[in-house]
């Protein structure tokens, strides 16, 4: 009975959230992290207009956001925000949720709440297909390599696990890392596998090094999963958890 009452209360809070004028679910994302989220100039079947112009957002995160908004009975609004500004934007009320390929790390949990994960991946290093590291199968193979990662992400911090690495300055976003690799300024950058595959589609001269068991990065489960970020104490948390848990594996693959 107690669990039932708690569930009813949570539902009432969410309904109250909508009735109080929050008819739109404002979602913050970078719109620059394919295949999770990106910006395009033309509308598409599943693309969503970005607030205040600037094109349309699409990608895996956008499809998750569409499902969440639909099942909450709310309109979806995408708020394009630089990666570093996402937590602050959420806490300041600029948007209601972060759906941006963000991992629920312990550090982030100090300031915002996270839902259950909606995606899980692994870490690879994106390299030139014809470069000296294309056949690498272990971190040790990258000794002396110039490697970077995105600023303020755990992708950058794990570079320290590479023996003898020539760690480069962190770059602001994946576009900057792609340009740096293509121009030869770096030998590789750390990415999750989906991001690496997306980069290869746009840049056929790219490849990526995946690692044999025990030869790759040591990571925590929270580092390689992706979840929705919410304000501390958000009434949306339980309901969004239910929605995410209701998305079948088949639906996730099709997205």
How would you describe each model-predicted region?
Residues 64, 138-141, 192, 231-246:
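Short amphipathic alpha-helical coupling segments at ligand-binding clamshell hinges
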Residues 32, 119-129, 201-244:
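Periplasmic-binding protein-like
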Residues 68, 90-91, 125, 142, ...:
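Hydrophobic residues within well-ordered alpha-helices
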Residues 84-88, 101-111, 157-161, 175, ...:
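A ligand-binding cleft/hinge motif common to bilobed small-molecule-binding domains
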Residues 23-102, 110:
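Extracytoplasmic small-molecule ligand-binding "clamshell" domains
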Residues 46, 128-146:
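Flexible hinge/capping segments at coil-to-helix
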Residues 7-16:
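Bacterial N-terminal signal peptides
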Residues 75, 154-171, 208-212, 241-255:
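Ligand-binding clefts/hinges and TM-proximal coupling segments of bilobed small-molecule sensing domains
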């Amino acid at each position: 009975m107690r669990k039932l009452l708690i569930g009813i209360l949570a539902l009432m809070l969410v309904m109250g959230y909508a009735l109080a004028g929050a008819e739109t679910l404002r979602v913050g994302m970078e719109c620059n992290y394919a295949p999770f989220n990106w910006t395009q100039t033309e509308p598409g079947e599943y693309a969503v207009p970005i607030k205040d112009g600037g094109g349309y957002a699409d990608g895996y995160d956008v499809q998750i956001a569409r499902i969440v908004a639909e099942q909450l009975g709310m309109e979806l609004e995408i708020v394009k925000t630089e990666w570093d500004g996402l937590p602050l934007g959420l806490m300041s009320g600029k948007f209601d949720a972060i759906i941006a390929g963000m991992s629920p790390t312990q550090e982030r949990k100090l300031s915002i709440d996270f839902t259950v994960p909606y995606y899980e991946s692994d870490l690879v290093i994106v390299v030139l297909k014809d470069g000296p590291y294309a056949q690498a199968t272990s971190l040790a193979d990258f000794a002396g390599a110039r490697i970077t990662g995105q600023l303020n992400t755990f992708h950058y911090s794990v570079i320290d696990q590479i023996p003898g690495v020539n760690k480069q300055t962190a770059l602001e976003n994946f576009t900057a890392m792609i340009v740096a690799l293509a121009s030869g300024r770096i030998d590789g950058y750390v990415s999750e596998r989906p991001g690496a595959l997306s980069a290869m589609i746009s840049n056929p001269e790219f490849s990526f090094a995946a690692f044999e068991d025990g030869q790759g990065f040591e990571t925590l489960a929270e580092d390689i999963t992706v979840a929705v970020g919410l304000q501390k104490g958000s009434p949306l948390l339980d309901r969004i958890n239910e929605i995410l848990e209701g998305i079948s594996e088949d639906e996730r693959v099709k997205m």
